[in-house]
Amino acid sequence: RNTKLYNGNISQSIWKTASDNSTRYYNYYYDDLNRIKRANYYSWSERSRFNGSFSYDKNGNLLRLYRRGAVVENPEVRNYRDYGTMDNLNYTYDGNQLTKVKDFGKKQYGFIDGADTDQEYVYDLNGNMTSDANKEISKIYYNHLNLPTKIEFETKRSVIYYTYDATGSKLKKEVARYGLPSKFTEYAGNYIYENNELQFFNHSEGYATPNNVGKFDYIYQYKDHLGNVRLSYTKNPNS
């Protein structure tokens, strides 16, 4: 049962999708410090399928995260066995810096627990993360603005480079892969290019992509209260 809240916390969200027109919703519950502690998912055929729960330490750092979801590659909507504990994460800190995440859920879904050491995350003196064992990131380099300029991976098969202007705005990203051509992404304001070809540009209501007839397809986005995209749509080309 949903309980109304009068302190600004959202107690429930409701939505439908065009594919089945089924009403789905989350009920949200908070602790005494207004931190979310539980999110219960409901629909007429999928009760509890995507539930989540959270706990924190005294500094507000996340200690445990439990999340249900799909635990097979191609889940069937009406097969409850295809859904279960996707993430059951325990977090370890040194002060307020995360040092280790242990997953007791399905390791190939949700968070990928790629390491099992005492120090899975390392930081520099400015607090920037310099390595991430779970993502096989061996070294991250930063500039004087504390922005990443180079990311090296343990496999040594790829390196990512970033270029910025003097204000810290990102200008270019290069993914250099061993034995393969590099992939360049360039950022010119709202215009995004890949390997010198325009991919899209942003506008106030979404973005536009070039089509094969020398024009642009405009995609419009409906966002929630946090700015997350909940719906993308474009005009019907036949109308």
Report the location of each language-model feature:
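Short, low-complexity export/processing leader segments characterized by acidic and small residues
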Residues: 230-238
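Acidic/glycine-rich beta-solenoid
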Residues: 1-166, 171-219, 238-239
